[in-house]
Amino acid sequence: MTTVSTNDFDQQHLWHPYASLPPTYPNIVIDRADGIYIVTEDGTRLIDGMSSWWASVHGYNHPKLNAAMIKQLGKMAHVMFGGLTHQPAINLGKKLLSIVPAGLDAIFYADSGSIAVEVALKMALQYQIAAKRPTKQQFASTHSGYYGDTWHAMSVCDPINGMHSLYGKQLPMQHFVAAPPMGFERDLTQSEREALTEFFVKNSDQLAGFIIEPIIQGAGGMRFYSPQYFQLLRQLCDEHNVVLIADEIATGFGRSGKLFACEHAAISPDIMTIGKALTGGYMTFAATLCTRTIADIISQSDYPSLMHGPTFMGNPLACAVACASIDLILSYDIEARTANMQSVMEQQLAPAVSLNGVAEVRCLGAVAVIELQEAVNMPVFQSLLIENGIWVRPFGKLVYIMPPYVITDDELTTLCQALLKVVSSYLTRKD
């Protein structure tokens, strides 16, 4: 069995995501990363199939991203955004407004995806208050959604997956509808349309906004659904004065096969959140964008200030590397690149369907999922991953990859074949 470096101090003192302290199994010490590889302290090279939780889309140690940060570092690493501005923030804003769905016209820079969602919810609520709709105080979402781990972001996550019961009555109560029916190419049935319509008829007087991950539900289940659902949601939000919030933090910048997943449905949201790939994984950074109508109604109200102001808002380093990251993404012909990635992953992972213990294999854009019938035993599975030279981070029954866009066909084939071997070995093991 392959062994890799761990660290006693880390295990005793450093809390990791969704883990106990000490963890139930040790964290692997990473020394460096380059291209599509992360390298452990003892020199083991692993193909990163996760893009570091979907952010490092250009791989690691990219010369253009490095250069952008070094150049900006020579000018200033940070300056407060209250009362001041700077060219990197302006440049990034112009670049974003030239590529996001039509109608989005105002930008709030945030620290992280979760904070971008908090700002989106706050923005929608403040807009409804300013628009003299005082009963619209709550939010709606679907089951199997995930929007982050800060307080109000958690409140709109799936109530079961989001562990709402753990926090008792302190977590704000929101409205939930059934998860969108699975199947990207599937038509909505009449009964499904009627159910969503009826929900709006019954509850819209209370709803400030409806938040959803367009087309791909990420950490709530890696589910792909029809653009028809998103189109119906846009229609119902319009009819009932409900703000449509599209969370593109995971899907934005090409992951779904379009630059933004909203494009699959040919619609624009009222508010959109972006993050992860925004800086190519170099810095924690995100943004919340809204229409000019929302910005104007808030800004011309009795309470004209949007009440949020992170210390590191509009960080110049983050803005500079985000500009470079977007330039790279636009240079890729992202639709062609992700379509090719989807084709390779579909072909290479198809044999997994025949494995006893696999429920489904599905791919869309640069996302591939092997759904098992039972939850993964992480210590066992992680050991097999390391033995086979790849890094993947399953959750529950879901074994999935979101590789960097810079991966070659040969490298992607190697990743998929290794993952297939891991899944096969895992399912046929004898404990």
Q: Where are the regions a protein language model picked out?
A:
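Conserved N-terminal phosphate-binding loop of PLP-dependent enzymes in the Aspartate aminotransferase
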Residues: 2-431
